[in-house]
């Protein structure tokens, strides 16, 4: 009978075919879809400092400036000149109770000039008149025989001493002010002065990425669990195929093992 071109004829052989043992292998591998040619990397952010290019000038107005020694002394003079008020008021009180008005009016007049001027000669003269008034008053009170007048004289002597100490500080400040040169700092405008400040470049922090490789541990790798093969082993046997001219052609064709259930 004839054989078609697309039909296969199995030829049994006398040699027994040994069944190949089934082997199972466990494969460990790392995913290469994300990092096919290099290790995985972690991108960290590290701050870097850059300088701003802004150099705009700004003007600041300060109150009660202290730009040099002269400014400091002038501020002290403004407050210490009130130390002349106490002696001047005491001289006015003595003037009202005195019988020689013209003589006792000289000291209060010097006190007015000492309060509104910074002339050291006038201030020193008024200080001497105030010291004379205080000493004269204490001596007059001590001359009494009563205890009240003696206690009053002690109290007045303490007050007069404190007043003269404050007055002497005012005179010392005027002497220091006279020996200090002129202020060559910023221009004074009223109670404050303008200071021109040239702004310096401001540092700005910009995060920069840092690439750091990440280590891979065995516990992080995917694992393929071996599964038992459910397919039976295949047997490869030679097969003869005839072409159109009826020439035999041998092929190796796998067939199922009929002995396995």
Swiss-Prot record:
Keywords carried by this UniProt record: Membrane, Transmembrane, Transmembrane helix
Coiled-coil segments: none
Subcellular localization(s) per the UniProt record: Membrane
Membrane association type: Multi-pass membrane protein
Transmembrane portions of the chain: 92-112, 122-142, 147-167
Origin superkingdom: Eukaryota
Residue numbers spanned by region Disordered: 1-22
Entry keyword Disulfide bond: no
Record's GO cellular component terms: membrane
This protein's name: Uncharacterized transmembrane protein DDB_G0286729
Lineage: Eukaryota, Amoebozoa, Evosea, Eumycetozoa, Dictyostelia
